[in-house]
Design a protein with these regions (language model features):
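A short, N-terminal "cap"/entry segment at the start of jelly-roll beta-barrel domains
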Residues: 1-33, 48, 75, 95-153, ...
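Conserved hydrophobic/aromatic beta-strand scaffold that supports enzyme active sites
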Residues: 36-40, 58, 78-80, 100, ...
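A contiguous, mid-protein "functional segment" used to position or interact
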Residues: 202-253
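A short hydrophobic beta-strand segment most commonly corresponding to one strand
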Residues: 38, 80, 94-110, 158, ...
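Conserved short histidine dyad/triad with adjacent acidic residue
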Residues: 20-25, 35-53, 144-145, 157-172, ...
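Glycine- and acidic-residue-biased ligand/ion/polar-headgroup-sensing regions
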Residues: 53-68, 174-187, 191
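Short acidic-glycine-tyrosine-enriched beta hairpin
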Residues: 58, 69-86, 192-209
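Asparagine-centered strand-capping/turn motif at beta-strand->loop junctions
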Residues: 88-93, 213-217
């Protein structure tokens, strides 16, 4: 069964000024594929960002700004953490919220993991190409691909559902994945049952679990979605339209993007 973690029900732990909510843990999802924390930092405070041996991860700024290992980060950035990374994230002059994700024993998900860059890699996702659904106004921006991160141990994207849009029902084979709701509200159809999701909620899907999303509100419903491992097969339910993505030729600010991504069907995105 899918797991839903409600952000407003998570019990934060105070640690040297920071408040940490453990959203996805082995106890919650029943395996150690992924760990996910939501961290709130008052202005000017800091928290440790460290990985255990064999672990890789990433950090995304949801609100505010900060500095990690000399790299300035804002809500435009996701930073990817190599093996053995240890550092401190220092919040800027405003209260800051981050997502901190970790993949233990990452080599089991990518036999070429040694080729992943050994230094910190940060991506300004607002410069990445915006893709639009072939069937409606949904938008997609890739956040983590082998071309961006240097590993296929995980894959990530941000998806926006404008009012009145919906995704066809499907499931995945070969990977598990989660959605963290960044903005708005939407409905997740999980094996035919409706579940309301709001900003701050996390949905974790295992393999072979049919799911779809609908936005029946008057505001955009936006979530980030990460797969572990990255490669997987997407299987569409009978009668569902394949979810294909078209290039728009612009980035999130309407400018020319830093690279080109062509038309492709979801799940058939190797080499991006």
């Amino acid at each position: 069964m899918p797991v839903i973690v409600r952000g407003d029900e998570a019990k934060p732990i105070s640690r040297i000024g920071a408040e940490i909510s453990h959203l996805l843990t082995a106890d919650v999802i029943g395996n150690d594929r992924i760990g996910l924390d939501h961290v709130t930092l008052p202005a000017g405070s800091s928290c440790d960002v460290a990985l255990a041996p064999g672990m890789i991860g990433w950090l995304q700024v949801l609100e505010g700004s900060g500095v990690l290992a000399g790299t300035g980060l804002t809500t435009k950035h996701i930073v990817y953490l190599p093996f053995g990374f240890s550092g401190s994230f220092a919040a800027g002059d405003a209260d800051t919220r981050i997502l901190f994700a970790r993949v233990p024993d990452a080599a089991r998900f990518d036999e070429a993991i040694a080729d992943m860059p050994g230094e910190l890699v940060h991506v300004d996702w607002t410069r990445e190409p915006v893709l639009q659904s072939e069937h409606d106004a949904r938008k997609r921006v890739y956040l983590a691909t082998p071309g961006l991160v240097g590993t296929s141990a995980f894959k990530g994207e941000m998806i926006s559902y404008p009012p009145g849009t919906a995704a066809p029902e499907h499931h995945h084979v070969g990977a598990e994945h989660f959605q963290y709701v960044v903005a708005g509200e939407g409905t997740a159809m999980l094996d035919g049952t409706a579940h309301r999701l709001r900003a701050g909620d996390v949905l974790y899907n295992y393999q072979h679990e049919p799911h779809a999303f609908i936005n029946e509100t008057d505001a955009d419903f936006v979530f980030v979605e990460f797969f572990v491992p990255g490669p997987c097969e997407t299987v569409w339910s009978p009668g569902a339209n394949l979810c294909a993505w078209l290039p728009t030729g612009v980035d999130s600010d309407g400018n020319e993007p830093v690279r080109d991504i062509g038309y492709h069907v979801h799940g058939q995105d190797g080499g991006i």
